[in-house]
Amino acid sequence: MTRIKSNWKFLLFVLLSGLVGGYCTGLYLPATFSSEMMQQLQEQGVTNELLVLSTMIQYGILYGVVLAAIGVVISRKVYLWKEFGFDKKGVAATAFISVVAALILFPGDKMVFGRFNSWVHDQYNVPPGLPKIISGLLVGGVIEEVMMRLFLMSLLVLIISILFYRHAEKVPTGVFVIANIVSALLFAAGHIPATMAMTELTPLLLFRCFLFNGGFGLCFGYLYRKYGIGYAMIAHGLAHLISDLLMIVAVSI
């Protein structure tokens, strides 16, 4: 009964995070679209209100609570599920990954890739508004971790285990590593459509997408495997929050 109650609390948390994060995403998303994308949406009759509603359903229900429920079941089956609790090493690893990832996003991204691409450079000239900050915390920190780590990474571990280690007493560490790498690459690839909606996709931006998101994904996957999905969520969310706050300070100076 305790386990069921714990799962329901987690699923409720994911649902609320997805609904609020989806709402905030729908609010700021139109401002990031290219003129061509906005014209396509207008031609299809997609209003701002409809966009907000669709992002709420998408992140709250489809990508959120549905995948979270499946992910909990699978992660328990492959022994990846860990109840959230204080872990000194987990806190230290999460803090380190969060700060490093945040600094890579800002000012790192602007200083490196911003020199070669005006679109990247311009992303850091405007301070993020409250909807974008909340979206980074909840959609990035919670929903993306549900999708890519709790669900996808766990599913990959299960599939590989069934195919190659059906009679093994326990899942080899290499299976978790492979699943983490594949899910990180897919996590990076999942950001390509969003980039294409905002600007022209160039080889440089493609490399940047896989370098940043793939690298971050590996780190979040490590936290998930070692300390549980809660620590992966915290690291992902904090990376967005810290980089956003640094950007606000830098722009206001």
Regions found by a protein language model. Name each.
Residues 31-46, 119-127, 206, 250:
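Membrane-interfacial helical/loop segments at transmembrane boundaries in membrane proteins
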Residues 131-253:
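Transmembrane helix-loop-helix hairpins at the membrane interface
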Residues 29-54, 61-92:
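Membrane-helix interface linkers and caps
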Residues 15-36, 105-110, 114:
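Alpha-helical transmembrane segments of multi-pass membrane proteins
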Residues 50-65, 135-148:
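Hydrophobic alpha-helical transmembrane segments
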Residues 7-14, 52, 56, 60, ...:
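Residue-level signature of transmembrane alpha-helical entry/exit and packing/kink sites
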Residues 1-16, 53, 85-99, 230-234:
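Alpha-helical transmembrane segments and their helix-start/interface "positive-inside/aromatic belt" motifs
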Residues 42, 78-143, 157-168:
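Juxtamembrane helix-loop-helix connectors linking adjacent transmembrane helices
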